[in-house]
Regions:
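Membrane-embedded alpha-helical bundles that constitute the cytochrome b-like, heme-associated redox core
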Residues: 2-224
């Protein structure tokens, strides 16, 4: 009697509206965090080497803020990417969101400590007089509770529905981030590009919500 080769378990398909979610190589989440901090380390290294140009503080602030916006957009793109292409990177959304917060904190600390030297009167005057700083601070205040509740314990305590309602404020944070960027530069080409991306993501979200409210067919697993 011939020996049979042991059969390997078949990968389980996850159907979704006639399509299967694409199984991507599973990168450990910790690696996402480590890779995410490389830009910050690089820019601080440039600063220590005195290679940030004539205004190093502004260059560092700009770079950290820009990376915060990039990570924010990446986190917002996770759900549309899954719904439109089947590419499922949902397990990395929290990491991208927290990286957004970490970069915003670094951006803010660079302004408060390195740029303003913790001069509270100068900082308060900036917040009151410069609209882009007022908008940036407002975005940070909204972002703080989102970062604090980016964990499973918060989901259990708040309940899934309340937690999702709270985290929809991230879209307002994205709008404020783009406005902050737009008003802080003289040449608006770069912030307009990122603003267009945010507008597309927000428009997609609103379109799906309207479709669902009107009784359109929206896959259950896409309602995130």
């Amino acid at each position: 009697m011939s020996a049979r080769a042991p059969s390997l378990p078949r990968p389980r398909a996850v159907p979704r509206s006639g399509k299967q979610l694409v199984a991507f190589w599973q990168v450990p989440k910790i690696l996402v965090y480590l890779l995410g901090f490389i830009p910050a380390a690089w820019w601080f290294e440039l600063g220590l080497a005195d290679r940030l140009g004539a205004d190093p503080m502004k260059a560092l602030e700009h770079a950290l803020g820009l990376w915060a916006l990039r990570f924010l957009i990446a986190s917002l793109a996770i759900t549309p990417l899954r719904q439109l292409t089947g590419i499922n990177l949902i397990r990395y959304r929290r990491a991208l969101g927290l990286l957004t917060f970490y970069y915003v904190v670094l951006h803010l600390l660079t302004y408060l400590v390195l740029d303003q030297g913790l001069d509270l009167s100068a900082i308060l005057a900036d917040i009151l007089k410069r609209l882009y700083i007022t908008i940036g601070m407002a975005g940070f205040v909204i972002l703080v509770p989102l970062a604090i509740t980016s964990n499973n314990l918060a989901i259990r305590r708040l309940g899934a529905q309340a937690w999702h309602r709270l985290h929809r404020w991230v879209y307002l944070v994205a709008i404020l981030a783009v406005l902050h960027f737009l008003l802080s530069v003289k040449v608006p080409i770069e912030p307009l590009f990122y603003g267009a991306v945010v507008a597309l993501l927000l428009g997609y979200r609103l379109a799906r919500s309207l479709l669902r409210d009107r009784g359109g067919k929206v896959p259950a697993k896409a309602r995130n």
